[in-house]
A protein has these predicted regions:
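Structural beta-alpha unit
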Residues: 73-107
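Small-residue (primarily alanine) positions within well-ordered alpha-helices
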Residues: 14-17, 71, 99
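Small/aliphatic-rich secondary-structure junction motif
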Residues: 1-51
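Glycine-rich, Arg-bearing micro-motifs that act as flexible, cationic patches
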Residues: 109-114
Length: 114
């Protein structure tokens, strides 16, 4: 079975990528689906002054979960199971290594994000 990664930022283009994947799966191309949301690091002295590292990590996770909500809803409505991951880092430098790490055959993404 193919593995597909959808880097998802909540943009209209990212939603179109989810819709495209759904159409592929419904056309009988079974896939193991992985959603990925990458959060930019919070590296602000003002924030680090009032939040602990654990609080920043929890904030990143919460905001990542919120960002994935629309993709989750569409995949669940289509009956497609998936794995969701939230990572912190530079978006461009995080997607490809993550795809390699989990052994993805396809990366399905819009032409530009938010």
């Amino acid at each position: 079975m193919l593995k597909a990664l959808i880097p998802f930022d909540g943009s209209d283009n990212a939603l179109r990528a989810v819709d495209h994947l759904i159409s592929l799966v419904q056309a009988r191309e079974p896939m193991e689906v992985h959603l990925l949301h990458v959060r930019e690091p919070i590296d602000s002295w003002e924030i680090r002054r009032v939040l602990t590292a654990d609080e920043i990590a929890a904030l990143q996770l919460s905001e990542g979960e919120d960002a994935l909500q629309a993709a989750r809803q569409r995949l669940e409505a289509a009956g497609i199971s998936y794995t969701a991951t939230i990572l912190v880092g530079d978006v461009a430098q995080t997607i490809a290594p993550h795809a390699t790490e989990i052994g993805c055959d396809k990366i399905i993404m819009g032409s530009s994000g938010a």
